[in-house]
């Protein structure tokens, strides 16, 4: 299995269990997810022991929480955040500087294509700003990557967009 981590925060962003494709001329990875409903905290009554009818009225016992959301977000503990268009512009400017500095250090040949492609991609993001939900890694590092969540034209299929150069690949 391959885990994709944010290179700044080291948070796990997604893994290769999803359908992943390169978009924006290889600048971004688009990861397709599914809407899921999960029950958390539910414990099988047979594991508790005792006779439920002899214990008195129901009410005590275990509580279950039902969570509905995008599987990528739930599985990798991504945290929703919000931006105004202006605050996103400020964030993305600082984020691009951080990624550019990292590329200059590790992959200098990627700097020019990244900066050229990023400018185009940011224009596209800002033009469709109202369509996106924003997610950060589990540690909520404000300097880390912000993933974008949108839905396909069918209105049902969620997908997330990640800047490829902001990710590190870890093989498990």
Curated annotation (Swiss-Prot):
One annotated Gene Ontology cellular component of this protein: cytoplasmic microtubule
- InterPro entries in UniProt: Mss4-like_sf, Mss4/transl-control_tumour, TCTP, Translation_control_tumour_CS, Translational_control_tumour_p
Chief location of this protein?
cytoplasm
Q: Where is the TCTP domain?
A: 1-172
Domain of life per record: Eukaryota
- Could you list this entry's UniProt keywords, alphabetically sorted: Calcium, Cytoplasm, Phosphoprotein
Q: What does this protein do?
A: Involved in calcium binding and microtubule stabilization.
Q: Which protein, by its recorded name, is this?
A: Translationally-controlled tumor protein homolog
Organism listed in the record: Gallus gallus
Which gene specifies this protein's sequence?
TPT1
């Amino acid at each position: 299995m391959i885990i994709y981590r944010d290179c700044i925060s080291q948070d796990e962003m997604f893994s290769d269990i999803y359908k992943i494709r390169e978009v924006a001329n290889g600048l971004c990875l688009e990861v397709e997810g599914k809407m899921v409903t999960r029950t958390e905290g539910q414990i099988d009554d047979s594991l508790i022991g005792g006779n439920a009818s002899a214990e008195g009225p129901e009410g005590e016992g275990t509580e279950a929480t039902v969570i509905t959301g995008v599987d990528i977000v739930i599985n990798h503990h991504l945290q929703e955040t919000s931006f105004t268009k202006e605050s996103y512009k400020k964030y993305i400017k600082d984020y691009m500087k951080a990624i550019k500095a990292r590329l200059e250090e590790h992959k200098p040949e990627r700097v020019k294509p990244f900066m050229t492609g990023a400018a185009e991609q940011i224009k596209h993001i800002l033009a469709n700003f109202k369509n996106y939900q924003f997610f950060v890694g589990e540690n909520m590092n404000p300097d880390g990557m912000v993933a974008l969540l949108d839905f396909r034209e069918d209105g049902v299929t969620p997908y997330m967009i990640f800047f490829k150069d902001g990710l590190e690949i870890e093989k498990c």
